[in-house]
C-alpha cells in the first residue's frame, strides 16, 4: 500500500460517492419528470377520447333528431311552425279575422 496516494484515493472515493449520489438523485428527478410527462399525455389522450366520443354521439343524435330539435328551437323562439303545412301558416282565428276584414273592405258602402 502506497501511503502517499492514500489521501488522494480517499478523497477520490469520497468525490466519486458524492458524484454517484448526485447522479442517482438527478436520475430520480429525470424519471419523475418523465412519469409526470407520461401522466399528462395519458390524461390528455383520455380527455381527447372522451371529447371524440361525445362529438360522435352528438353527431349521431343530430343525424337522427336534428330536424326535431330545430323545430323545437324555432317554436321556443316564438315562431309558429307546422311541419306539415304548405307554407301558408295561419291559424283558424287569423283566417276568420282576415276574411272578416276582407269582407268589410270589399263591401264597404260609406
Swiss-Prot record:
Keywords from the named record = Capsid decoration protein, Capsid protein, Host cytoplasm, Virion
* Coiled-coil parts of chain: none
* Organism annotation: San Miguel sea lion virus serotype 1
Report the domain remarks: The N-terminus domain points away from the virion surface.
Q: List cellular component terms (GO).
A: host cell cytoplasm; viral capsid, decoration
Family, per entry: Belongs to the vesivirus VP2 protein family.
Instruction: Please give the function described in this protein's UniProt entry.
Output: Minor structural protein that forms a portal-like structure at a unique three-fold axis of symmetry, following binding to the host receptor. The channel formed by VP2 may allow the delivery of the viral genome through the host endosomal membrane.
**Compartment annotation:** Virion; Host cytoplasm
Lineage summary: Viruses, Riboviria, Orthornavirae, Pisuviricota, Pisoniviricetes
User: Per the record's keyword annotation, is Metal-binding included, yes or no?
Assistant: no
User: Which additional comment does the entry carry?
Assistant: Translated by a ribosomal termination-reinitiation process from the bicistronic mRNA coding for VP1 and VP2.
Where primarily located? virion
Q: How does it assemble?
A: Homooligomer. The portal-like structure consists in 12 copies of VP2. Interacts with capsid protein VP1.
Q: Give a single Pfam family match.
A: Vesi_VP2
Write down what this protein is called: Minor capsid protein VP2
